[in-house]
C-alpha cells in the first residue's frame, strides 16, 4: 500500500504521554498508532521502535525522545514519548518537546505513584495547560469499586496541583489490548475514546503569529541619516510599519515607533513570527538599546528580576558541573540573547543540588529581563551550559 500523504489542512497539536515508569506510556503510544493506522490515519510504530528512542541534544542537554505522528478526523498530532524519567524531566524543562496537552497514563493496578505526582507537578510548573488521563491495565482490576477509588485518587491529585481534577476526562482501558488488536471496550474502543477526549478537551494552541508582537534584540547598528536598527527573529506576533513598540528589559522601558521593517535588504510592510528582520526605530540612539532587550507590543510584557523556576542541572557526562552547588549560588542566566547574573535560593530543606537533579528554585537577577511565565533559560558558568530552566511564576 502506498503511504498516505498527511494532509496539512487539519489543525496541528503537540501532545505527549507522561506518567510513572512501567505504567504503559510507550505501549499506549504504540497502540494509538496501531488503531489509527487501521483507519489510514497513522503509520504503525511498534513498542521497540518507540522504546529505542534516538538521543537528541537541546541546549547541550542529551535527551532521548521518540516522536510519532498521527491524525484523527479533526486534527494532526505530533506525539512525544520518552523512555526514561530523567528524559521527561529534561524534555519538559527545556521545552524541547513543547506540549499543548498531555496524556497522563496511570496503571489501574497501582494507582498514582511518585513519578505520576512528579510529572503532574512538572506539567504545572512548565505550563503544560491540559491533561487527559488514560487509566491503563483496567483489565487487571476485577473490582469496579477499586477502579472508582483509583479514579477518585487521580482526580484529587490533579486538583491538588491546580488542574481541574473534577472535569478532566479519564478513559479506562488496556493499551496492550489495543496494541494486540482486541476490538473490545478496553482495547480498540478505549483508544478511540481516548483520542476523542484529546480532540475535544485539549484546545487548539494559539498560533505564534496571533500572539502579541515580541522580538528579542540580537544586534543593533546605526545607519547614517536613517537612525537605529535593531535586528532579530520575531518570536511571536506581527509588527507593522508605523506601529508603536516598547523596548523592554535591562533599562527602563521606553516607547518608540517602527518606521521601517527590512528583511534580506528588502523593505517590507510588516515582520511576522519566524521572520529575521531589521526594525528601524524612530528617535532611538544607538546606545539606548542593546542585545538582551526585546521589542514588544506596548503593555504586553514587563521586566522582572525575581521569579520562581523549575531547573534541571546537567550531569558531569553532559558537560555540566562535577560538584553540587549550595544556597547563594551565582551563575549566569541566559535569556533569549543574553546572560544576566543572578542568585539562586534553594527551597527550605534542600541543602544542596547535585548534577542530574531537578529542583524548584527562586532566582534573583541583578538586571531586569522581559519575562512571562513559561520563558525558558539556560544556566551558564563562563559561557558553558550547566543547566536549563523555565520560569514557573513571577515574584517581582
Curated annotation (Swiss-Prot):
It is found in: Cytoplasm. Residues 174-176 are annotated as: G5. Mg(2+) binds at residue 26. Residues 81-84 are annotated as: G3. Pfam families: GTP_EFTU, GTP_EFTU_D2, GTP_EFTU_D3. GO terms for cellular component: cytoplasm. Keywords: Cytoplasm, Elongation factor, GTP-binding, Hydrolase, Magnesium, Metal-binding, Nucleotide-binding, Protein biosynthesis. One of its GO terms (biological process) is translational elongation. The keyword Nucleotide-binding applies. Belongs to the TRAFAC class translation factor GTPase superfamily. Classic translation factor GTPase family. EF-Tu/EF-1A subfamily. This is Elongation factor Tu. It comes from Geobacter sulfurreducens (strain ATCC 51573 / DSM 12127 / PCA).
